[in-house]
A protein has these predicted regions:
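A charge-rich, low-complexity, intrinsically flexible signal that marks solvent-exposed coils, linkers
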Residues: 1-84
Length: 84
């Protein structure tokens, strides 16, 4: 199975986990997904009034320079760990 196929499967699997991950893990999943699918963060950082959007953007921005393939593999590995 190609990395892209594994990434797509992990996306589906992440929606069917037996329990919801904690907020920090959810941010990591979000950031890895965005980096794997879109590359480095772009656009403006959300303002102080959008704390959730700001946290999500910051988590994604911390992965700047990580290749999309590496981010996809990390995402797949994290979802696999959460499935256990």
């Amino acid at each position: 199975m190609s990395l892209q196929d594994q990434f797509t499967q992990a996306q589906a699997d992440s929606k069917n986990l037996s329990e919801r991950p904690d907020n920090m893990t959810m941010l990591k999943l979000y950031a890895l997904f965005k980096q794997g699918s879109k590359g480095d963060a772009s656009g403006e950082r959300p303002g102080f009034t959008d704390m959730i959007g700001r946290a999500k953007f910051d988590a994604w921005d911390q992965l700047k320079g990580t290749s999309q393939d590496d981010a996809m593999q990390q995402y797949v590995d994290l979802v696999d760990d959460l499935k256990d």
